[in-house]
Amino acid sequence: MSLDVYLYERVTCPKCECRIDTNHRLYSANITHNLNRMAEAAGIYMHLWRPEEIGIDTAEQLIEPLAEGIRKLLANPKQMRTYNASNGWGMYEHFVPFVQEYLAACTEHPTARVEACR
């Protein structure tokens, strides 16, 4: 089982200036569910796995929480590694780059629509 995260392009209608969602995928990534406890410890479980449940629908809304989560991950590597999956599928060394890359994509595409599939 895994988590898939997506960013989709949103465009502005030139006539009425309303936002229109598109199916144009700007970013996607996948990570194992085995990292959910590490995400919780870093304070970003809901932001990654269930953004719609906390009112997040644009990438801009993820920038600060993900940045804070990365700070926590990097400040406490020893503690965070205690959440490594014993089977090797879900390690700190995989999770940190996943969150960093997702943050970079959110920063690059702040108006993008966020979607998470579990």
State the predicted function of each range:
Residues 1-118:
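Acidic (Asp/Glu-rich) sequence patches and key acidic residues
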